């Protein structure tokens, strides 16, 4: 089953506010404008109260692409049949004037419709004689009229194509619908616009959303920009999004991650006799897990929230330790053993952290309470301080492979920028023992290029417009949105490809 998708909350709140509202959705071909329009009907809970006019795509094509639409929304394509009606509750002064001009042979291209004086008022109804030149708009008006006083959502995909079909400028059609539907009858209207960039039509709608497809590090990046929403506060105007699974999902940077009560880690088993799991199944699928005797590098931007880094190392440490194996850890940001214990011990049985984890700290940070788990870094000889035989001696009951999880921002702050050049003994020992080495670096780190040169797998994590993205440099992958699910009581990575 495809993912449910998600429209930015500001757009949903905009349409849910009292009164009528209009929104222009624009962007180049392939950016998801039709998907956005159709999905909006579902997220507003108004699928049955929506009228979709497709001027470019046949109903059959829509149903093939959006299977969930069938039996829920009946699109209306361009029509040739003529319809009439005896009375209408929906305001239609501007439409009647436009039809009148068409019947007189005029183009109907004035920017603003003139007031009309024809028609007869009967109670709360305005009865006028209909023209028969605009059957698609007539059908939309009749749909809305049949549901008054309830609100409906009318979607026109696209207003450019409808204008071409009629020989009427799109601006004129928007003005007519704005006056009749939005202002006169308090209905919601969405116009799909095929052009991108700033246009004079932007001034005619209450809101404007643009969709764009660009590149980030040679990978596809999709960006949704809320250019305006009249009367609606916009806290975050730009979202990354994906069309994965045929749905538009905007990644919410303000997403409320609610941790459940901490639970014991459920170990992810080895992928093979030569590869342990990272504890992060989506990453295992990309890189094939942690190959024994080899190096994995994570290049993590300083713009990435610290929680994301902590959940990443929590998953790796817990998955190794929960299987009775050993961990030697240099925390990022010159972190302490005490903080590492607080981070991961709630996901382990009592005593397992002390038995299977050793944390390297700068000598000045050593605490007596953590003397059993702390290994000191004196700051002069990194190969001696991180000597692998000492780690093995400290973890006599732990099974193999061990995990060496080392943050190079801390190592560089203790030993200097050339620290990695002095760690040949550590890398050689890990390789001989068939253990696994994971290094964290930042893009600015002097060790980044050298570590990535040693690594068989390189992941890069960054923050783009407030959303955290991940991609593989080795092996080469597309761009993913990275989020975390804590509902199970421990951190679980969720990757969504940006396609």
Predicted regions and their residues:
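Glycine-rich P-loop/Walker A and Walker A-like loops and their local beta1-loop-alpha1 context
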Residues: 6-11, 16-46, 277-337
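Short glycine-/polar-rich loops that comprise or flank the Walker A/P-loop
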Residues: 20, 46-49, 186-187, 203-207, ...
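Hydrophobic/aromatic beta-strand patches that form the interior of the parallel beta-sheet core
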Residues: 23-25, 51-53, 190, 207-211, ...
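Conserved nucleotide-binding/hydrolysis micro-motifs of P-loop NTPases
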Residues: 31, 56-60, 160-161, 195-198, ...
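Conserved inter-motif catalytic segment of the P-loop NTP-binding fold
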Residues: 49-162, 325-413
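P-loop NTPase motor core
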Residues: 126-203, 208, 377-454
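Phosphate-binding and hydrolysis-coupling loops of NTP-dependent motor/remodeling domains
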Residues: 206-281, 459-499
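Extended amphipathic alpha-helical coiled-coil/heptad-repeat regions
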Residues: 294-299, 331, 351-429, 439-440, ...
């Amino acid at each position: 089953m495809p993912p449910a998708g998600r429209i930015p909350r500001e757009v949903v709140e905009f349409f849910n506010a009292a009164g009528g509202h209009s929104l222009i959705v624009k962007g180049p071909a392939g950016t998801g404008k039709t998907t956005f329009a159709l999905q909006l009907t579902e997220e507003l809970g108004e699928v049955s109260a929506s009228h979709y006019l497709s001027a470019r795509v046949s109903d059959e094509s829509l149903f093939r692409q959006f299977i969930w639409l069938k039996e829920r929304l009946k699109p209306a394509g361009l029509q040739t049949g003529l319809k009439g009606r005896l009375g209408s509750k929906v305001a239609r002064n501007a439409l009647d004037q436009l039809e009148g001009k068409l019947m007189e042979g005029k183009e109907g291209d004035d920017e603003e419709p003139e007031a009309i004086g024809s028609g007869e008022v009967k109670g709360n109804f305005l009865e006028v004689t209909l023209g028969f030149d605009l059957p698609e708009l007539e059908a939309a008006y009749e749909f809305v009229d049949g549901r008054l006083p309830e609100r409906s959502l009318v979607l026109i995909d696209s207003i450019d194509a409808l204008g071409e079909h009629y020989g009427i400028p799109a601006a004129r059609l928007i003005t007519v619908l704005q006056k009749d539907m939005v202002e006169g009858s308090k209905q919601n209207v969405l116009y799909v616009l095929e052009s991108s960039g700033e246009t004079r039509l932007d001034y005619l709608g209450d809101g404007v959303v643009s969709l764009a497809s660009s590149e980030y590090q040679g990978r596809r990046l999709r960006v949704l920009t809320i250019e305006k929403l009249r009367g609606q506060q916009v806290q975050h105007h730009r979202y990354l999004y994906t069309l994965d699974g045929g749905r538009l999902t905007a990644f919410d940077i303000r997403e409320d991650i609610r941790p459940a009560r901490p639970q014991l880690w459920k170990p992810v088993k080895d992928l093979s006799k030569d590869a342990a799991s990272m504890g992060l199944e989506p990453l295992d699928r990309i890189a094939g897990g942690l190959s024994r005797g080899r190096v994995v590098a994570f290049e993590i931007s300083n713009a990435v929230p610290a929680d994301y880094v902590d959940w990443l190392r929590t998953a790796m440490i817990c998955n190794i330790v929960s299987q009775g194996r050993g961990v030697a850890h240099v925390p990022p940001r010159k972190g302490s053993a005490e903080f590492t214990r607080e981070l991961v011990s709630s996901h382990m049985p009592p005593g397992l952290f002390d038995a299977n984890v050793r944390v390297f700290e700068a000598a000045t940070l050593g605490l007596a309470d953590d003397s059993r788990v702390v290994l000191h870094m004196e700051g002069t000889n990194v190969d001696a301080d991180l000597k692998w035989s000492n780690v093995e001696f400290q973890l006599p009951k732990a099974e193999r492979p061990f995990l060496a999880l080392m943050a190079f921002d801390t190592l560089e702050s203790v030993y200097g920028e050339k620290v990695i050049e002095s760690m040949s003994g550590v890398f050689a020992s890990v390789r001989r023992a068939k253990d696994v080495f994971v290094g964290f670096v930042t893009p600015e780190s002097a060790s980044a290029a050298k570590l990535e040169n040693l690594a068989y797998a390189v992941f890069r994590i960054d923050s783009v417009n407030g959303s955290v993205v991940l991609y593989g440099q080795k092996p080469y992958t597309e761009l993913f949105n990275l989020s975390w699910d804590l509902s199970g009581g421990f951190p679980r990575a969720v990757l969504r490809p940006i396609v």
